[in-house]
Amino acid sequence: MSRKTSRGLGGLLFLFLTAGHAWAADDLPVGWASVAGGTTGGQGGATVTVSDAAALEPAAESTPPLILRVVGTVHLASPLRVKSNKTLIGVGPDATIVGGGIFLTKVSNIIIRNLTIREAPDAINLEGAAHHVWVDHCDLSKCTDGLLDIKRGSDLVTVSWNRFHDHHKTCLLGHSDKDDIRRMDTGHLRVTYHHNFFDGTQTRHPRVRFAEPVHVFNNYFKNNEYGVAALMDSGVLVEGNVFENVEHPTHTQYGDSPDPGRLVERDNLYIKSGTPEVRGSVVEPRTAYHYTLDRPADVARIVPQGAGVAR
């Protein structure tokens, strides 16, 4: 699965560069973004190439399905508010969004691939019950708040083959302990994180509230303060990952959140790391979708080789 997925991006880029409008039909997400109809982005729509904010913003904020090919560095003065049924894909190794990240609210069926996003308030933010979103092969760093935050009833998301670096609070999944947020988020926030490289980021990989099941598999955690935090009766399965020099691989109680979460860990590899906290049982993701694990012994090699842009 890992080799096919990693190669798929290169094949997709090749198709874009040669045909201008093609889509690799077998290049689909694994995990929560694949269920309940799946996530296809702008498939079936026109392909538009953009290289500045003046072209990107109206295209991303338009109604029709579109495949947006981002070339070079695009400077944004504010977050890009992407409408439903869009694919944003960077062309080559240097497609970059700077200054304003990507904001998804009350939208669905979005694919974000092969983009470097940095120096924004949030690199990517999902809220307002956004659903069916796939973030794949991106490089996210150096933002003011979060790199990839998912909250306010958002659901059915896959985060795969990304590199996160030069940041503190990385991936928030559920933003508040309050009762009204509990009612909003319970039954939602189902996210799969796989084959991501958390490269020296400090916390929140992710920090989870209320969601179940959240699936964290085959990721490489390196030089982090903590890995995964399951809080507020969330249920998280952490399997087949590598934790290297991570003080606290997992938490089930953290910060000022009053209630613990549930976390099951299995088949993880711990290198110069602390002891994981575990608690309770979690709904199995296999009841919702199929996935294939890479061997934990291979993760520290294949993830840095395959995660991030132009991989």
What kind of region is each of these model predictions?
Residues 71, 149, 172-174, 207-209, ...:
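A cross-family glycoside hydrolase active-site/sugar-binding cleft signature
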Residues 101, 123-125, 147, 170-172, ...:
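Structural detector of coil-to-beta-strand junctions
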Residues 53, 70-73, 143:
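N-terminal post-signal-peptidase region of extra-cytosolic proteins
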Residues 208-311:
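Extracellular beta-rich repeat passengers
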Residues 34-40, 75-79, 230:
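Short aromatic-glycine motifs in intrinsically disordered, low-complexity regions
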Residues 85-93, 108-119, 130-144, 154-175, ...:
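Right-handed parallel beta-helix
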Residues 2-67, 272-311:
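Extracellular "leader-to-stem" segments immediately downstream of a signal peptide or signal-anchor
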Residues 57-65, 72-89, 95-114, 118-130, ...:
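Extracellular beta-strand-rich solenoid/capping regions of secreted or surface-exposed proteins
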